[in-house]
A protein has these predicted regions:
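Conserved phosphate-binding elements of NTP-dependent enzyme cores
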Residues: 1-167
């Protein structure tokens, strides 16, 4: 046999922004957004896949701009973050959260672990393959919306490996 491709996988972080998540890095988020956009409810409302991104308007919460938290400035002390008072950490606006795919809102799906997602997306081959590869590498405990900035070097490395393996 011949080597078709060689990939170097390091422990470098996979995202510099909390907007980068396990689901966005692996490409699973694009497919999940398409599933939501294909629902009858989304079609009736005229929502495309972009509506289910917490990175763009419309769709994301206007208060926290899709972050799920807001910065709180404290006098004489370092600032901190607090759960968004409008979306309560959901990252999306109220209208977007009214759309359900198989009984679940988009923010609920982002709260699923890789193990849950593997089961629930079993009928969707690309998603099942993505979450299967992550689970096989011992990452079944991570949630789909887990911020890339909060991953350890080893977790980031295994996510990169899983992403390459499921291509």
């Amino acid at each position: 046999g011949r080597v078709e491709r060689l990939v170097r996988i390091t422990q470098k972080p996979i995202g510099r922004s909390p907007r980068s998540t396990l689901a966005t890095y692996t490409g699973a988020m694009d497919r999940i957004r398409s599933l939501f956009a294909a629902t009858d409810d989304a079609q009736e409302r005229g929502y495309g896949a972009g509506r289910f991104s917490f990175n763009t308007t419309p769709g994301r919460c206007p208060t926290c701009e899709g972050q799920g938290s807001v910065s709180v400035e404290l006098l004489f002390m370092p600032g901190t973050y607090s759960t968004c008072p409008e979306c309560h950490g959901a990252r999306y606006d109220a209208e977007t959260l009214q759309v359900h795919w198989e009984g679940h809102r988009i923010d609920e799906v982002l709260g699923w672990t890789v193990a849950e997602a593997r089961e629930r997306f079993a009928e969707h081959p690309q998603l099942a393959r993505t979450f299967g590869a992550l689970a096989d590498l011992g990452l079944d405990y991570l949630t789909l919306g887990h911020p890339a900035t909060d991953l350890s070097g080893g977790e980031a490395q295994r996510i990169k490996l899983a992403t390459e393996l499921q291509r």
